[in-house]
Amino acid sequence: MTQKIKCALIGPGNIGTDLLAKLKRSPFLEPVWMVGIDPESDGLRRAAEMGLKVTAEGVDGLLPHVLADGVQIAFDATSAYVHAENSRKLNALGVMMIDLTPAAIGPFCVPPVNLKELVGRKEMNVNMVTCGGQATIPMVAAISRVQKVKYGEIVATISSKSAGPGTRKNIDEFTRTTSGAIEKVGGAEKGKAIIIINPAEPPLMMRDTVHCLTEGTPDQAKITESIHAMIKEVQKYVPGYRLVNGPVFDGNRVSVFLEVEGLGDYLPKYAGNLDIMTAAAARTAEMFAEEIISGVLKLEPVVA
């Protein structure tokens, strides 16, 4: 039996609950704590039924148990507003943070684009951008590694049912964080992000549109090849990630149309936005966990 790295999840909402299902299947990670603020929360109840320790007293309810229970990685699926404080408290105990909020106090992580580099830098807080960012930035990066992208714009459409209260509270942060990551990770000179929450019934599957303006005339063959290679990389951890149409070339504009089907771990398969976020976070934590298990990475307390 391989040694597993013990994890805590903060935020028992849609994202936290979906992530828990994925961590339960991980060969390297063992979820042991679920942290919430509402004792009546469905997510806390579910986690307790799965055998996790739970607290409804927020991160402060977890802190006294971190060292005794050997927690080394924590996932924050709460809100951008509280993440900095959560991270400070846990980093001080030597716990690495995987941030699933748009707080972005640590470097952005989009696994197929820059995960290996971040593991090598021994970061103690990495930010998973947003669901729209995880779905689209690999495509921007696939184009920008072929030639310079002057402008990258993404439109993420998610079903209303898949957007919980935390996601709704963080809409402005979603836009800012995703735009920044299109530039920093995707490689576009200027980035723009738009999110649409669609109330249609039955709920629609997550759809994403990516438009990039290249500096010169797009090299169609190379860009097409690069996009298909990148899609295969994303499909390694999100099998329901699909190219619906494209790349479509129109002058200097390259457009890619995607849909993301979820595994249906917590919400039904239309909520691919949960999957792309939680699967990317689990993939990231697994890479760090492998380094910890092999002795290459030693987590040290961070003094604030």
Curated annotation (Swiss-Prot):
Catalytic-site annotation from UniProt: 131 (acyl-thioester intermediate)
MF term (GO), any: NAD binding
EC identifiers of the protein: 1.2.1.10
Key words, A-Z: Aromatic hydrocarbons catabolism, NAD, Oxidoreductase
Catalytic activity: acetaldehyde + NAD(+) + CoA = acetyl-CoA + NADH + H(+)
Record-linked InterPro entries: Acetaldehyde_dehydrogenase, Acetylaldehyde_DH_C, NAD(P)-bd_dom_sf, Semialdehyde_DH_NAD-bd
SMART domains: Semialdhyde_dh (SM00859)
One GO process term, biological-process aspect: catabolic process
Residues that, per the record, bind NAD(+): 162-170, 273
Top EC class, one word: oxidoreductase
Top-level taxon: Bacteria
Recorded family membership: Belongs to the acetaldehyde dehydrogenase family.
HAMAP family cross-referenced by the UniProt entry: Ac_ald_DH_ac
Protein name: Acetaldehyde dehydrogenase 1
